[in-house]
């Protein structure tokens, strides 16, 4: 079974409401059109966010909606931006997003990569001057649904403290890969930091201390104080989140750091865009993304390759289990289970997120009650202290 949110466990159990997919879909569609997006654009954005919620990744789901609105009001996201292809070959392209909504330019970029892969065997597209694009895995799955191998990565505001450093210089820099298989597609999506900034935000909302080994304060010392770590990240005062592997080479810190650099190469370096340490500065997002689609047909019979991979995945699931363990998962199984469970039981939304949604509805002139009936969030608190 899948926990309510991956990596958060019991933190949520007493402080969230469950809402139907249809309710949140309608809410997001109205809100994003109120933000100034077209109906088609709003549909892409909400699909990325609610897909994250259905996977159990609440940190990247509809709770991001209010922050996006703040970024639009600050001029960081340009609702009317027209992404521009500034370099292109039969197998590659570079897009300047001109500060567009990350989900919109990313959807376009992966569509380009898919079409190139169908024609030439591979498509690689790098994007600069964008904004937060949601979960990396959404775009990898776009290619997978077309029978291709999909790859997606993005840099972000600097939150990763390199091994032996005390200042954040890389983003969470997630990497995602999806490959067709039966009965479950292979689907891997993970940050190259111990956790994402979104996880810190959720602990902040819950007023819970961070687990040991996640974060560092401005002086480079271990910290469990979520508000302090987040404030330091926003103010660029130092500290941040540890690389995947933790704080020492003995635990593999240099590996998470290295994976983060691979992401940086595919996103900011190939696009000649801003590296993570320059993202979210000067009032602009400047975030960069990388997308790749690979056509298995250029390696042989796609059906045979899919069957070969599916056989190996089943062998992994059938491997001898450790004492006390009932099941071995392959990547992508838990997301399938999460979608089924959450569609049946409703999408969990934190009460403090609902406070933000209520405020947003009031600000935009939307009828909160038409979505949530008589429910009103029990807490009225600016957990971000103005920092969304």
Model-predicted segments: where are they?
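Single conserved hydrophobic/aromatic residue that forms the stacking wall/gate
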Residues: 1-12
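Acidic, glycine/proline-rich low-complexity segments that act as flexible tails and inter-domain linkers
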Residues: 13-21, 26-45, 50-51, 58-79, ...
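Catalytic-core signal marking the mid-to-C-terminal active-site face
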Residues: 14-19, 24-27, 265, 270-272, ...
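Active-site cofactor/substrate anionic-group-binding motifs, chiefly glycine-
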Residues: 60-114
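A generic, well-ordered mixed alpha/beta core segment in the N-terminal half of proteins
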Residues: 90-182, 190-191
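Phosphate/diphosphate-binding glycine-rich loops and adjacent basic-rich segments that engage nucleotide
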Residues: 160-234
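Secondary-shell segments that build the walls of catalytic and ion/ligand-binding clefts
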Residues: 209-278
